[in-house]
């Protein structure tokens, strides 16, 4: 969505922004906060990272400085060989330092903002509905609040307690649906029901089909990875691989950016082994919150994948205990993992562990050495999963920690991985038909365009440039800068 829809509604959005002291950042500023006006940087010094203040829209970036409250370099962590067991260098971008503690505020920024600046969303009458299995609705409700827009969250009742508490704090309407992480159809069904009941009031912002989701990662996350690579590479080291578990497939938009910059990169999409939709056309429930929803997202560019992999949720649950208990951390130090790394392991949430395991599996599968660099992300931190940690119980011992370290980290294997041929990629792409054409109203023509139009994804993902023009015009008319 890149052109004006309704000038009268646009004027209402501008007036709401003026009343609520709202200034919208551009994608360019989120990628490079040095472009943020000094007056806004000065305001941010007195505003907390999670505060419900509209200026925190400018903190939707990988470059928040947790020490000063200003901006700095990309927040990331390199995992040493003593921890991973592989020679390849693995870098993890850290989502903990975004507002809400997750980079999902980026994925939810575009769908709502693109409508506000084109007059496609009336903040005085309409509500933004965020269907989700986790952090997406948290980020969406947060951005809605900052942008002066009422919100609705639809998510499975089995998600962590921390998610529901946060949504209540934001005043969102909350509709829990039956099931857990992979029960996305129930979320879709409730969303459809609410939309039919309140067609004029509700605007559905579905992360699985909104191209502004991967567009944000193409414009912001991909360049952040490139920046870290250029800073950290030594000698003949090369950017070899990207591993990302996929729920909505938004983060994989960074892979489209990296493919343009580094054509030989290998990109692997991960999912829970207990719900191997991409790997085996499979299904099932699992415990890796935020990924694997028993369908192929509309916004997944299957052509850009080289590999898919299944990550055992049992491994992830064992490793969060290893990383977040006194016994586990003591064991890691004894095994030579630097204390500086050990003290930061709480920056890795459950899906982050899955990403790290996937990166290790890729390093082993392709027999990578010290000249290879792999990137992944930590969507969030353990701050959002303390209830899950408590559910695992107490009484964790050093012996258990040693077993978990050897079995799940050092013992990570190359099973449940598949390199993709042309027809493997097309098989994954064709699975979109059953969710999106049969159930969600998309057309076969749209589906085929995604596959056969070689320029389709480039045009979609570069839409942020036009959106930036509209944001600047919107801010000019609001008149606060």
What would you call each of these model-derived segments?
Residues 1-481:
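PLP-dependent amino-acid enzyme catalytic core
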């Amino acid at each position: 969505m890149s052109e004006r829809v309704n000038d009268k509604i646009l004027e209402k959005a501008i007036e709401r922004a003026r009343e609520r002291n709202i200034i919208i950042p551009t994608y360019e500023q989120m990628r490079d906060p040095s472009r943020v006006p000094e007056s806004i940087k000065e305001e941010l010094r007195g505003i907390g990272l999670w505060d419900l203040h509209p200026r925190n829209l400018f903190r939707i970036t990988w470059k928040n400085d947790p020490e000063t409250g200003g901006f700095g370099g990309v927040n990331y962590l390199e995992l040493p060989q003593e921890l991973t067991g592989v020679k390849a260098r693995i870098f993890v971008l850290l989502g903990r330092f975004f507002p809400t503690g997750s980079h999902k505020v980026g994925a939810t920024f575009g769908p709502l903002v693109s409508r506000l600046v084109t007059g496609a969303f009336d903040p005085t009458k309409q509500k933004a509905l965020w269907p989700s299995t986790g952090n997406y609705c948290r980020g969406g409700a947060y951005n809605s609040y900052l942008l002066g827009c009422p919100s609705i969250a639809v998510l499975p009742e089995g998600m962590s307690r921390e998610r529901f508490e946060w949504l209540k704090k934001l005043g969102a309407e909350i509709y829990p649906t039956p099931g857990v992480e992979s029960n996305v159809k129930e979320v879709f069904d409730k969303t459809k029901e609410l939309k039919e009941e309140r067609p004029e009031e509700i605007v559905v912002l579905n992360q699985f089909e909104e191209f502004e989701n991967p567009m944000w990662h193409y414009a912001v996350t991909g360049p952040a990875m490139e920046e870290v690579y250029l800073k950290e590479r030594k000698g003949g080291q090369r950017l070899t691989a990207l591993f990302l578990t996929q729920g909505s497939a938004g983060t994989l938009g960074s892979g489209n950016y990296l493919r343009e910059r580094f054509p030989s990169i290998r990109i692997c999409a991960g999912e829970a082994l207990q719900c191997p939709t991409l790997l085996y056309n499979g299904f099932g429930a699992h415990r890796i919150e935020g990924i694997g929803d028993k369908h192929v997202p509309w916004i997944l560019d299957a052509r850009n994948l080289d590999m898919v992999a299944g990550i055992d949720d049992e491994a992830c649950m064992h490793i969060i205990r290893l990383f977040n208990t006194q016994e586990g951390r003591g064991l890691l130090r004894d095994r030579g993992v630097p204390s500086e790394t050990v003290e930061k392991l709480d920056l890795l949430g459950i899906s982050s562990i899955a990403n790290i395991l996937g990166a290790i599996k890729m390093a082993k599968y392709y027999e990578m050495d010290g000249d290879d660099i792999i990137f992944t992300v930590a969507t969030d931190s353990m701050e959002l999963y303390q209830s899950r940690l408590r559910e695992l119980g107490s009484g964790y011992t050093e012996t258990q920690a040693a077993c978990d370290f050897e079995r799940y980290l050092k013992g990570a294997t190359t099973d449940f991985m598949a390199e993709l041929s042309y027809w493997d990629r097309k098989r994954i792409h064709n699975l979109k038909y059953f969710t999106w054409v049969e159930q969600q109203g998309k057309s076969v023509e749209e589906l085929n365009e995604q596959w056969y139009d070689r320029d389709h994804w480039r045009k979609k993902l570069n839409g942020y440039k036009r959106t930036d023009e509209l944001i600047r015009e919107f801010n000019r008319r609001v008149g606060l800068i």
